[in-house]
Design a protein with these regions (language model features):
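Bacterial N-terminal signal peptides that target proteins for export
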Residues: 1-14
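Predominantly soluble domains enriched in secretory-pathway, periplasmic, or organellar proteins
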Residues: 5, 16, 20-410
Length: 410
């Protein structure tokens, strides 16, 4: 998503995101990733996010279909072999995932119809969806939001260029489940307007609240379940903190990272770990804010922030266009999926491995074309990565893949 407005598929493709060769393991220790540790399985025309179920001993993968929406599915994989054990049909495309393993429910963001899909992980059946918002006439919605002048002119010109009249005012990308409250938290990325946070009561199966105040392109989200905090990052260099119980915004911090696309919370160090994406979206952001945004970071970096203040504790370069990240608390390793390009014919994406305490880079593993999202076996034995196509692979009709990486104790 290069800006606030684009075609719906382009909007999501910038956010969400083959032979495998291990590159330059010289910096890695004996516990590094070796070629024989990597297994790849081609699965579907599109794969996006994953959730590992301990109770089911299964890996669930969202597999939306762009050509024929009714062919969208959730794939249930054997986590050891990556064999498909079940295909769960969906009526619409599902992208981001959150798992309530104790309740045997998988939740999916349905980015283009304003709903959250629900899947029973024991029966492998879709249970319908929870409605969050309806389509709006966008010009009317912008005027009702008080948008005028140059900003309104810019937005209307974009609508005309892409021939859009009605659409959903917010895009649903990431989703987090809070086991203590039974709530789902979903940033609603504003389609020309400031972003919001959707709160879903899963026990009642309905929308509980829509919370405003999340700025330009709210994208990243993570939970501090014990501390009862929700953290949301946006594309204007802010991290917003919400009380997970009262649903009150308790802090908005200006941070030294411009585009924190995804976040994870480190409870041991009370830190927020995030990837600063580094994609040029200046024109859209400046029109949205009404002034020229002054960049604070070079982008393509990993950040460690103090969760209380937003202060930078550490920052290191990763490879270009980082997307997903995952913290292995046991081994204190931070894994980052880097696309290394957007809409390129030949992708050369990588997985970078960092010491989570210091952010020292330990290893770089080639995972072309475009590694996207990550999941971990709770025992810490295996790391899973979705790998998306580049332009050439898409044109050739090749399926996208999931990679399993055997991990070793340090």
């Amino acid at each position: 998503m290069s800006g606030t407005l684009a075609t719906p598929r382009a909007l999501l493709s910038l956010l969400v995101a083959a032979s495998l060769v291990v590159a330059g393991a010289a910096q890695a220790d004996d516990a590094g990733i070796r070629p024989q540790d990597i297994k790849r399985q081609a699965l579907s025309s599109t794969v996006v996010e994953m959730a590992y179920s301990t109770s089911q001993q299964a890996l669930f993968v969202s597999a939306p279909d762009w050509k024929e929406e009714a062919r969208s599915r959730v794939l249930r994989l054997d986590p050891n072999t990556l064999a498909i054990k079940a295909e769960i049909p969906l009526q619409v495309k599902g992208f981001g995932v959150a798992l309530n393993d104790a309740g045997n429910r998988l939740y999916l963001t349905q980015a283009f119809n304003g709903e959250v899909g629900v899947v029973d992980t024991t029966t492998n059946h879709a249970l319908g969806s929870i409605k969050l918002l309806d389509k709006a006439v966008l010009e009317q919605a912008y005027k009702q939001a008080g948008i005028s002048g140059k900003r309104l002119d810019f937005l209307l010109a974009e609508l005309k260029k892409f021939k859009i009249t009605e659409d959903y005012l917010y895009r649903l990308r990431e989703i987090k489940y809070d086991a203590q409250s039974g709530r789902l938290f979903l940033p609603g990325l504003g389609f020309g307007v400031d972003s919001v946070l959707y709160v879903v009561d899963t026990k009642a199966g309905k929308l509980e609240k829509v919370i405003p105040g999340f700025g330009y392109n709210a994208v990243g989200i993570t939970l501090d379940e014990k501390g009862r905090r929700v953290f949301v990052s946006n594309m204007q260099g802010q991290v917003i903190t919400l009380n997970a119980d009262t649903l009150a915004i308790t802090a908005t911090h200006e941070v030294q990272a411009d585009q924190l696309l995804n976040l994870v919370y480190d409870p041991a160090g009370n830190r927020l770990l995030g990837v600063d994406q580094g994609i040029d979206r200046d024109d859209y952001r400046n029109h949205h804010l009404g002034h020229d945004y002054v960049k604070r970071s070079s982008g393509h970096r990993v950040f460690a922030l103090d969760a209380d203040s937003g202060k930078v504790l550490a920052s290191e370069l990763t490879d270009e266009v980082p997307i997903g990240l995952l913290l292995d608390e046991r081994s204190q390793r931070l894994y980052v999926a880097n696309r290394k390009g957007v809409r390129v014919d030949h992708g050369a994406g990588t997985l970078t491995v960092f010491d989570a305490k210091t952010l020292k880079r330990l290893q770089t593993v080639d995972l072309p074309p475009h590694p996207n999202s990550l999941a971990l076996d709770p025992k810490g034995d295996a790391l899973f990565v979705t790998v998306k196509n580049d332009g050439a692979s898409t044109k050739a009709g090749k399926p996208e893949s999931v990679v399993r990486i055997q991990l070793h104790s340090n």
